[in-house]
Amino acid sequence: DLLSTIQLNGITLLSLLFLMIEIFPFIVCMMEYFDKKKIVGKEDKKSLRNCFVIILFAWIMAYLALFPGVYATDAPYWYHEFLRKDIPISSQWSPVYCGIFYLFVNSGKLFFDNYSIGFAVFTLLQMSISLYVIWNILSFINDKTNKTLVILSTLFFLLPMHVILSLTSAQDSIFTASFAMVVLLLIEYLLDEQFLDKKNTIKLFLWMFLMCVIRNNGVYVLAFVLLTALLLKARRKLLMLLTSVIILVAVYQGPVYALCGVQKGTALREMLSLPL
């Protein structure tokens, strides 16, 4: 619908600027108010839960408004590359993500004779993962800083673009969530080198691997982290963890792709961010 398309032009940018100017005094007043209040102990956790409940409510309302979700332009190809044998499965998009998308959408058709039901469950799951990551981020901010930053972070997560992305059939949503968790866990490790116990090591390993599985250029992130860790002479445990994930991803994108008949050749283009 052309009438529903937002035109990104000078007027739109100017409108956004005026909107930010109007919101800014409200944010400043709120920051000054909470700076004057000393909040400790159980009240911190209560305010954290209240902030998350606000985000949860807003996101559920957005989910209902956008129900069953937002179909991206590539979604039809993802569906048909698993449905039809004459269309090869491409590594340009994550085969795992596309396969899960197909599984949910096709299940909606098989069990309810409705594609939208399957897609609604898919977007709900994707949104739940994003909310889980948001909870972890808010908890970290609440534990390490103060309530003011929790409030500001809550306002940030209430921006419409975040929930819209989480309800869109785009691998960027899960990639962003996994990337954020990797960064968060690495920050935890930098603050406390004893953080990487068995449980947290497995958690970091899985989030790193998921980040690379969802988007091919996730390997670039790990390569940069590995290089930085080597220069900073990080502990061997972290170096081995990063190396093992990169090796596993190489096996996944090599022999596993070949075994499953995934067509390669476009992944490098995506990793280099070249136009299609």
Question: Language-model segments: which ranges?
Answer:
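Transmembrane-helix motifs of polytopic, lipid-linked glycan transferases
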Residues: 25, 121-144, 181
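Juxtamembrane membrane-water interface segments immediately following transmembrane helices
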Residues: 72-73, 78, 239-276
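Membrane-interface alpha helices of multi-pass inner-membrane proteins
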Residues: 200-215, 226-230, 245-252
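Transmembrane signal-anchor helices characteristic of membrane glycosylation enzymes that use polyprenol
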Residues: 1, 15-25, 44-71, 246-258
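Aromatic- and kink-enriched transmembrane "portal" helix at the membrane-lumen/periplasm boundary
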Residues: 3-9, 64, 95, 115-123, ...
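Specific aromatic-rich, kink-prone transmembrane helix
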Residues: 83, 174-192, 203-204, 208, ...
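Loop-to-helix entry region of an early transmembrane alpha helix in multi-pass inner-membrane enzymes
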Residues: 12-17, 95, 99, 109-132
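Extracytoplasmic catalytic/substrate-binding loops of multi-pass membrane glycan-assembly enzymes
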Residues: 66-80, 87-104, 108, 112-117
